Structures are given as C-alpha cells and as structure tokens.
Amino acid sequence: MSFLSRFVCAVPRQAIFRTFSTLTGSSGCKYLPESTFNTIQKVSFCKKSAKGKDGDLKKKCAEAAKKEKEAAEKKKCAEAAKKEKEAAEKKKCAEAAKKEKEAAEKKKCAEAAKKEKEAAEKKKCAEAAKKEKEAAEKKKCAEAAKKEKEAAEKKKCAEAAKKEKEAAEKKKCAEAAQKKKCAELAKKEQEAAEKKKCAEAAKKEKEAAEKKKCEERAKKEKEAAEKKKCEERAKKEKEAAEKKKCAEAAKKEKEAAEKKKCAEAAQKKKCAELAKKAKEAAEKKKCAKKAGEKGSKQSGSDKGKKNGKKNDMKNKCAMLAKKAKEEALKKKCAAAQKKCEPKK
C-alpha cells in the first residue's frame, strides 16, 4: 500500500479537504500540526509514480522533524543560558549588597569606637583638670596656713618683747626707788651739807638715768620703726613676686590652651579634608561601576561575559584599593589624634 493510500485511510475526509485547500492557497487547519502542513504543501500531487512520491515525502518529513528537534533544542539551550545568566546576575547583586552592608556595619562600628574613644579622652582631660584644680587649692590653703602661722609667731614675739620691756621698766623703777630711799636715809643721817650734796648727786643721777632711759626708748622705737618698715617692704616685694609668678603661669597656661585649640582645629580640618577626598573617591567608583554595568548590558552574550569578568576584576581591585585607603586614613587620623593628646 502506498503512502497516499495509507494517508487517505488514516486521515478523515474533512482533514484531506482542508489539506488541499491549504495547498491551493486557503488558510487554516484544525487537525494536523503546522509543520506537517508545511511539509505536505511541498508535496506534489501530480500523477507520478507512487514509489517516488513515497520516498520524497518520507525524506521531507524526516528533514522537517530534524529541524523541529534542532529548533526545540536551541530554544531549550537559550532558555537554560538565560536562566543561568539571570542566576549569575542575582548572585552578583546579592554579593554586592552583602559587601555594601558589611562596609556600612564596619563604618558604623568605627564611628562608635571613635565616639567612645573621644568620650574617654574627654573624661581623662576632665579628671586631669580636676586634679590640677585640687592641687592648686591645696597649695593655696597651705600658703594661707603658713602665713597665719608666721603672723601668730610674730605676734607672740611682739608680746614677749613687750613683757620684757615692761619688766625692765619695773626693774628700773625699783632701782630708782631704792636709790631715792637711800638718798633719803643719807639725807637724814648726814647734816645739811651732806644733804645738799646728796640731793645734788641724786638729782644728777636722776637726770642721767632719765636721759639714758629716754635715749634707750628712742633707740628702741627707731629700731622698731625700721624693723616694721623692712618687714613691710619685704612683704610687698614677696607679694609682687607672687603676683608676677601667677601672671606668668596664667600667661603660659593661656598660650598652651591657644596652641592646643589651634592644633585641634588644624587636625579637625585635616580629617575633614581626608573624609571629603574619600567620599569623592567612593562617588567616582560608584559612577564607574554604573557605567560598567550599563556597557555590559548593551553588549552581546559572549562580549557580556568577558566584560562581566573584567568588571568583576575591576570591582575587586577597587574594593581592595578602597580598603587600603581606609586603613591608611584610619592610621593617619589615629596618629594625628595621638599627637593632639595632652602629654602626661
């Protein structure tokens, strides 16, 4: 049985009618696949030998089936390649997001550590200032106590000198009284001449004693006045020296504070400039990365793979350079901060 007779037996009459309608130019068929109709359209229904028709039709059907199989395999391979590409892109995006998250966490930790360090340094400076203030107050109290002690000793010495002076005066008065008593006894015992002589002698002695007493008193008063004058001069000189010393110390502290303030301002400015440069470098890197991604999307599949590898390598190099730059910046800031710290 030839292929056409088998085809007529197997296929309904309506399908055969539609097949010949397709060959004559009309469209549409609901019974056979499009590939089969494409193959049948190429078959000639002229009156030729049944064997020749059979062989050509089988060959054409085999070629059509082979082409369909190859097209299906190509479609399947293209879909698999597309899925692999999408998976690779998702993985790449996930890794980039993970790296950005890690960088943000590192930055956050570094900022927290920096704040803790600054708080510790502020606390340390406050404690040092408190200790200096307490030491200054102790020194001031010690000096005040010393001055009070010296004043008490001076007062004690003055009182002792006064008592000694009063005792000397009492002694002199007692001696004078004794002499007067002796003179009176001598006056009574002796005659009028002797009485006159004793009176004159007593008068002379009294005048000499009074003169001596006045001279001693004047001398002591002069010495006391000179001593007081010298003490006041020494006290004024001491106070002037202390004032000068305090003024110089205050001037030095003020200069040191101004120098420290200038150094801190310079360091802050330097750190701000370094941070600005790092930020600009990061922005440039981000722009370069976006440009690289855009270029890789526009290129073909093979070219995209090569560009992707190049972009990956560039990104890795940029990340390494960024990390090295951040480490150098951290070291530089730490060294500058160490220089700004007050020496113990």
From Swiss-Prot:
The gene is mst101(1). One of its GO terms (biological process) is sperm axoneme assembly. Possible structural role in the sperm tail. It is associated with axonemal structures. GO terms for cellular component: cytoplasm. Testis. Located in spermatocytes and spermatid bundles. This is Axoneme-associated protein mst101(1). Residues 285-315 have a biased composition (Basic and acidic residues). The keyword Cytoplasm applies. The predominant structure is alpha-helical. It comes from the Eukaryota. Residues 74-344 are annotated as: 17 X 16 AA approximate tandem repeats of K-K-K-C-X-E-X-A-[KQ]-K-X-X-E-X-A-X. The keyword Transit peptide does not apply. Keywords: Cytoplasm, Repeat. It is found in: Cytoplasm. Sequence repeats lie at residues 74-89, 90-105, 106-121, 122-137, 138-153, 154-169, 170-185, 186-201, 202-217, 218-233, 234-249, 250-265, 266-281, 282-297, 298-313, 314-329, 330-344. Residues 206-244, 285-318 are annotated as: Disordered.
